[in-house]
């Protein structure tokens, strides 16, 4: 599981953060996003993969397609609380943020459609993998609709 310490210190993810996730095969969503650095607030374009409750990023698309490659970073979306637009926060078009109780990460998509698709995909993953919602509560919610 991704630790807040690892995010805060910028350390590479450990293998246990993404062990058992075949990120190179059939991701729920993948594509280019520009991510703001944690300490030096520069923007870097990275290839992102969303799969099984993990948001992983790589230097490029080729690295994400290789079995056994190491992601540049991993976020467990089940630990996150919100994903929403953030154009007004970072003053850039197509920006969105992913937040937990202790950190916020900012991303920029290539266009409005991509931004909305990432927000929707990550939002679904947060709900599916959140530790605050039990399986029975999800089933209960589905039956009440």
From Swiss-Prot:
Keyword flag Magnesium: no
rRNA processing as UniProt keyword: no
PROSITE patterns listed in its UniProt record: PH_DOMAIN
Span list, region Binds specifically PtdIns3P: 29-53
Positions of the PH domain: 26-127
GO cellular component, as recorded: peroxisome
Protein localization: Cytoplasm
Keywords, comma-separated and alphabetical: Cytoplasm, Lipid-binding
Tissues and organs where the protein is expressed, per its UniProt entry: Ubiquitously expressed.
An MF annotation (GO) of this entry: phosphatidylinositol-3-phosphate binding
One Pfam entry name: PH
Matching SUPFAM superfamilies: PH domain-like (SSF50729)
InterPro entries attached to this UniProt entry: PH-like_dom_sf, PH_domain, PI-Interact_SigTrans_Reg
Assembly description: Binds PtdIns3P.
PANTHER family in the cross-refs: PH DOMAIN-CONTAINING PROTEIN, TANDEM PH DOMAIN CONTAINING PROTEIN
Job description of the protein: Binds specifically to phosphatidylinositol 3-phosphate (PtdIns3P), but not to other phosphoinositides.
The name this protein goes by in its record: Pleckstrin homology domain-containing protein 1
Organism: Arabidopsis thaliana
């Amino acid at each position: 599981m991704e630790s807040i310490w690892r995010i805060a210190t910028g350390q590479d993810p450990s293998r246990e953060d993404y062990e058992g996730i075949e990120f190179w095969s059939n991701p729920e969503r993948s594509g280019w996003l520009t991510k703001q650095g944690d300490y030096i607030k520069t923007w870097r374009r990275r290839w992102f993969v969303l799969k099984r409750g993990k948001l992983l990023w790589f230097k490029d698309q080729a690295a994400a397609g290789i079995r056994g490659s190491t992601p540049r970073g991993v976020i467990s979306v089940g630990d996150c609380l919100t994903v929403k637009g953030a154009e007004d926060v970072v003053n850039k078009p197509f920006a969105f943020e992913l937040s937990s109780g202790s950190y916020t990460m900012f991303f920029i998509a290539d266009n409005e459609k991509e931004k909305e698709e990432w927000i929707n995909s990550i939002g679904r993953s947060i709900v599916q993998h959140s530790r605050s919602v039990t399986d029975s509560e999800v089933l209960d919610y589905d039956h009440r609709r």
